[in-house]
Amino acid sequence: MDYKITGYEPAQLFHFFEEVSAIPRGSGNEKGISDFLVAFAKERGLDVYQDEVYNVIIRKPASAGAENAPTVMLQGHIDMVCDKLGSVEHDFTTDGIDLVVKDGVLTANGTTLGADNGIAVALMLTVLDDDSIAHPALECVFTTDEETGLVGAETLDKSQISARTMINLDSEEEGVATVSCAGGVVVTYTCPIAREHKTGSTLTLDISGLLGGHSGSDINLERGNGNLIMARIIDRLMVAGEPAIVSFNGGTKDNAINRECKAVLVYADHAAAEAAAEIARGIIADVTAELEVFDPGFTCTVEIADDAEVEAMDQKSALALIRALRLAPNGVIRRNVATDGSVEVSSNIGVVATSDDEVKIMLSPRSSITSLQNEFKDRLQTLADVLGFDAKFEFEYPGWSYAEHSPVRDVFVESYRELFGSELRIESIHAGLECGLFAEALHGLDAIAVGPTLSDVHTPDESMELASAERFYELLIDVLKRLAA
């Protein structure tokens, strides 16, 4: 193929990235890239394992002289988030990524780039392909469906892995190593609703412009949540009068801070709707002032339409919905005040959806401490019981605890200092990583998560600094050489 990325070393790293990018590999569509990896291994005479969900493990013997060094696992995921600009024609099920190189930065042409986590795949392929590198025995683990709930890592038969040293390649900032993460679970509240025929004037409230963000790593930034703001407005309107809720919909992902929410209410006549609109505008002004620093793009439009005939929730159903949203925990719940104030427990109300006969609320609670996670789940169940909602807990994944003693962390710190003359920053993140699933299954696992600088992942603005990838490869090879000694 004709390669677009030139002038960076090793060239093979960037060639592999381009080859991987040419293969459609959205979550749930990973057979093609998985089969590509199997063929890659067989062409080089490497031992390869592929399971029924298309996870792949490629094993490479130690380089000469490193046969007695402990085996090392390199790990990343092969799926990517698929998102694009509305103006772009791109079919993620059949089309590869159209790469764009400009001023040392790699992006895609109006779509997600997939460097999260395609760069990990390219890094491992480069190491596996180069017989001049000094390294211990390697187990390169390529997992599926990470972006939709760490599914591949959870499903993988961990008995296939002998390594007890793990280098996860799914971190997104050069010069930073992640050494622990939070666990989490998806909680879905559902409640049946009754509807009744109403005539009058509708009041439509439409929230937009919020920054949103990741419900783990961005939960401490005090950004607005459209679902909560909408519930606040409607709660006040319920105190002032008797609106009936026709619909309330906000968010599409439990693990994203909600940016947009739209609700439709119905009043007996135009005068009642206009009076409610004035109250709503006052609350909107308050919220705008409250978010001026943290989320300045917030807007909420208010529109009235007369002569409406709708099927609205009855008062009992409407009260159940608003009470649930006003009482369900959201945001930072607990911090570690003994150390750096990092978030230990949080919750995010990511999705609210009303249908003809049901309301659904999806929450994403997280904790870096298992006992606190379990206690918080109990609280959420109690709240559901009190409010009359059914609660379902699913897609749970474990946290990854900080290790006081970590040889692989020490090696990375020493290597980074000697190569670049500065200190590697060590951090914990309040988000889920595949490391947690591997650490839970592989007793005594010594793990670290690292990677080059990526920006705006999961969006059409996603980018990768090519020089950062170049430097990171240098670091990875040096670490493997040290681990082989």
Regions found by a protein language model. Give the residues of each.
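Acidic/His- and Gly-rich active-site-bordering loop/insert found
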Residues: 3-105
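Active-site-adjacent substrate-binding region
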Residues: 223-248, 402-445
